C-alpha cells in the first residue's frame, strides 16, 4: 500500500520542469513598445538592442537607427518592463508545507547569522516557475525563524541549480526585532494589548551578541567562530542588515541600534507604521521593504485602507520603499507582486512610481541596481514584454521574457492545465 501511495504522490508532483534557457547567442532588437524604465521614466516608442546578455542600446525608435539584428521583435502597442524583483522571499526553500522534508526555510536556535539560504534554494521548485509568467524574474531568498534568521542571497529564477541561479550571495543578515507589545488571546478570540516586559532584556541580548561578534572580528587571535564570521561586512557595507519590525517604537529603536553599532546599510522589513518615523528613516538613509499590501489593518480601530496607502505615505516623505510578500501562502502568492504595486497606484501613486516599488527601488535596497531593476544601456537584459499594463491582472499578459538576455520559458503546470481544459471546453462547443 505504501508503495502505491508513493507512486501516486510522484505522479501528482512529477510534471516536467521547464528547461533553463541557453546563453544568448543571437542579437535581439525589440521595436515599438512603450518602455517603462523602472526609474520613473517612459519611452513611448522604444528601441531596445540586446547583445551578449546586456542592453546595448535603448532609446526613442523615432530618432535612433541601429544595425540589423539576428532577431527583431515587433512590440508595437505593447509594453516593456524590467524584470520584477521579489525581496524577502522563501521561494525554493519550501515546496509543500505539509511535507516536513521539503521545508528548509528555518533552522533551530536563536542566533544563526551563518545559516545561508542559498545552499538550500531549490532552483527546480514548481513554485518558482509560476512566478515568471507574471514578470517576477528575480528574488531575494531569505531564511526565517529565530532572532537572527540567517543570511539571504539574490537569485534569478531560471536556472539548473543554486550555483547557476545566484546573482549576489550573502547580501545581508536578517534580524527579527522584538515586539514592544503583544496581543492576548488568539485569532478567533483576541484579547487586549499587553506590554512586552521582556522587550528591553531582549534588545540587550541582541546588543550583547553584536558586541561579541564585532569584538571577535577585531581580534587577531580569537578561536574561529563561524556564526561571528558571518557578521563580517555589516559595518563596512558589504552586507546589509535587514530588521523585521512593524511598530513605531521598534522602528525607532532599530534605527538607534544602527547608529550605535555603526551599521552602514540597514533596511526595515515590514514597516507597517514606518510612516510615523519617516523623517528619522530618511535622515539615516534607511529604506523599507513594506509589509504585504493585500492585507488587513493591524488594529481594529485604524483606517481599513492603510495597507494600500502605506507606500504613498513613505514615498511622499522621501523614504526609499519597495514591496515584499512575506506572510501566509507567501511562495504561492509571489506571482501577485505586480498587482500589489497596481493597488498602490490605485491609492495615490502614479503608475511609474508604483512600478519602481518592484523594480528600481527593490534593486537599490538589495544592492543590485548596478545591473538590475531598470532598463538602461549596459545593464542586464532582464526584462519582459506584456500585451498591456503589467500591474493590472487583466492585462498582465506576457509574450516574451528575458533573463540576462536569455529568452526563458513562460510555461508552468498552471499554463499546461489552462491549455488542457481550454481545449476541452472548445471541443464541447463544436
Model-based region annotation:
Residues 249-255, 259-316:
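Extended hydrophobic/aromatic segments used for targeting, binding, or gating
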Residues 1-23:
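Bacterial Sec-dependent N-terminal signal peptides
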Residues 127, 134-252, 256-265:
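Polyanionic/metal-chelating signatures
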Residues 33, 48, 53, 77, ...:
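Divalent metal-coordination and catalytic microenvironments
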Residues 32, 96-97, 102-108, 114, ...:
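His/Asp/Glu-enriched, well-ordered alpha-helical/loop segment
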Residues 33-36, 44, 376-421:
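C-terminal cap of metal-dependent C-N hydrolases
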Residues 21-22, 35, 39-81:
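Histidine-rich, glycine-flanked metal-binding segment
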Amino acid at each position: 500500500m505504501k508503495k502505491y501511495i508513493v507512486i501516486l504522490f510522484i505522479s501528482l508532483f512529477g510534471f516536467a520542469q521547464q528547461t533553463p534557457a541557453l546563453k544568448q547567442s543571437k542579437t535581439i532588437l525589440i521595436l515599438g513598445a512603450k518602455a517603462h524604465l523602472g526609474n520613473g521614466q517612459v519611452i513611448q516608442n522604444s528601441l531596445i538592442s540586446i547583445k551578449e546578455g546586456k542592453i546595448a542600446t535603448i532609446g526613442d525608435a523615432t530618432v535612433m537607427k541601429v544595425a540589423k539584428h539576428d532577431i527583431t521583435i515587433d512590440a508595437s502597442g505593447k509594453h516593456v518592463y524590467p524584470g520584477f524583483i521579489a525581496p524577502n522571499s522563501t521561494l525554493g526553500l519550501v515546496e509543500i508545507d505539509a511535507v516536513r522534508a521539503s521545508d528548509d526555510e528555518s533552522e533551530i536556535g536563536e542566533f544563526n547569522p551563518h545559516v545561508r539560504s542559498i545552499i538550500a534554494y531549490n532552483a527546480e521548485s514548481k513554485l518558482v516557475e509560476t512566478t515568471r509568467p507574471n514578470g517576477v524574474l528575480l528574488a531575494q531568498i531569505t531564511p526565517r525563524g529565530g532572532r537572527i534568521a540567517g543570511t539571504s542571497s539574490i537569485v534569478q529564477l531560471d536556472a539548473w541549480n543554486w550555483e547557476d541561479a545566484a546573482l549576489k550571495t550573502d547580501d545581508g543578515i536578517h534580524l527579527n526585532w522584538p515586539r514592544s507589545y503583544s496581543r492576548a488571546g488568539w485569532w478567533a478570540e483576541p484579547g487586549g494589548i499587553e506590554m512586552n516586559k521582556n522587550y528591553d532584556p531582549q534588545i540587550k541580548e541582541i546588543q550583547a551578541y553584536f558586541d561579541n561578534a564585532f569584538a571577535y572580528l577585531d581580534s587577531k587571535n580569537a578561536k574561529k567562530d563561524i556564526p561571528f564570521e558571518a557578521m563580517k561586512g555589516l559595518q563596512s557595507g558589504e552586507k546589509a542588515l535587514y530588521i523585521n519590525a512593524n511598530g513605531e517604537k521598534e522602528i525607532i529603536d532599530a534605527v538607534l541600534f544602527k547608529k550605535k553599532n555603526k551599521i552602514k546599510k540597514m533596511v526595515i522589513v515590514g514597516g507597517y507604521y514606518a510612516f510615523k518615523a519617516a523623517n528619522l528613516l530618511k535622515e539615516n538613509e534607511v529604506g523599507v521593504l513594506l509589509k504585504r499590501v493585500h492585507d488587513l489593518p493591524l488594529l481594529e480601530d485604524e483606517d481599513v485602507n492603510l495597507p494600500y496607502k502605506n507606500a504613498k505615505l513613505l514615498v511622499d516623505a522621501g523614504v526609499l520603499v519597495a514591496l515584499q510578500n512575506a506572510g501566509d501562502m507567501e511562495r504561492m502568492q509571489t506571482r501577485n507582486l505586480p498587482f500589489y504595486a497596481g493597488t498602490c497606484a490605485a491609492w495615490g501613486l502614479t503608475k511609474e512610481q508604483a512600478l519602481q516599488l518592484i523594480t528600481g527601488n527593490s534593486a537599490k535596497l538589495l544592492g543590485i541596481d548596478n545591473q538590475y531593476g531598470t532598463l538602461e544601456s549596459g545593464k542586464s537584459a532582464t526584462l519582459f514584454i506584456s500585451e498591456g499594463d503589467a500591474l493590472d491582472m487583466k492585462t498582465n499578459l506576457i509574450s516574451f521574457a528575458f533573463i540576462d538576455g536569455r529568452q526563458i520559458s513562460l510555461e508552468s503546470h498552471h499554463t499546461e492545465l489552462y491549455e488542457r481544459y481550454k481545449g476541452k471546453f472548445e471541443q464541447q462547443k463544436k
